């Protein structure tokens, strides 16, 4: 069955999340914020797991436009912030989240040493 979502990603509810999904009253995705970009602590909330599935051509075209227009650059680090594109992506199509099974799913892999605890089949 073909998904009607433009963009899908897993989330997990936790304390002190690095990122937090913002939803409206009917639980639809609105935005995602990062603790490093705000001036207050995130006490709890749904965070992303750093894994995203999307319809590449539409999202890539939009993200390229957002970068060219300097609309998704971090105010603090001047880096491109992919998560900042989500509020624009949702205007193109449906964003769906699925619940991750454990908090381990939210741990990022940024360095080779981060793979040590992972068990692969």
Predicted regions and their residues:
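Conserved core of the sugar-phosphate nucleotidyltransferase
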Residues: 1-73, 100
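Conserved alpha/beta core of the MobA/IspD/sugar-nucleotide pyrophosphorylase nucleotidyltransferase superfamily
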Residues: 45-121
């Amino acid at each position: 069955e073909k998904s009607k979502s433009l963009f899908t990603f897993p989330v997990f509810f936790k304390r002190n999340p690095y990122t937090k999904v913002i939803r409206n009253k009917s639980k639809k995705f609105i935005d995602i914020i990062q603790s490093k970009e705000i001036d207050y602590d995130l006490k709890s909330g749904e965070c992303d797991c750093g894994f995203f599935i999307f319809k590449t051509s539409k999202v890539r075209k939009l993200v390229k436009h957002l970068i060219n227009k300097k609309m998704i650059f971090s105010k603090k680090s001047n880096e491109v912030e992919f998560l900042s594109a989500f509020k624009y992506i949702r205007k193109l199509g449906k964003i769906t989240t699925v619940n991750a099974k454990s908090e381990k799913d939210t741990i990022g892999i940024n360095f080779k040493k981060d793979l040590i605890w992972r068990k692969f089949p």
